Amino acid sequence: PSDISSAGTKEFDLLMNKGRLLDYRDRELKAYLMLMDMIPALENDDLKRMGNIIWEIEFRGSKRAEVEHHSFEIYHYMSRLREAGFEFVGMSSVGPSIAIITEKDRAAVEGIVRGLGLSITVETMIDNEGLKITHTC
């Protein structure tokens, strides 16, 4: 839990100034990760690989600015969740909340997050029919 604000002038400056500068610097790497790594991972339903890519992006561009803004305490929790075996861990775009995607069942997830002093706030199922990639010549 954090009492750091995510709405206001300071946050706007963070995301629109520092975040955009960092996005500009990391644009080539992020584009490469999306095109060369994420799309194939999505096509292959490779959740672990998707999680590794998102984990890398968490510390690039505007996501890095958000993690820094919310203190490295959020990184600490995210890192512990990854170490616990969750395939996909990232900070939500409306942080400071952590999003996980996993193949583990709810009982396993509850046990792990409770052990870290966290709780499940929202749970949803993935719509595996939502992405369709069509190749044309």
Language-model regions, residue ranges each:
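Glycine-rich, charge-dense phosphate/pyrophosphate-binding loop(s)
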Residues: 42-137
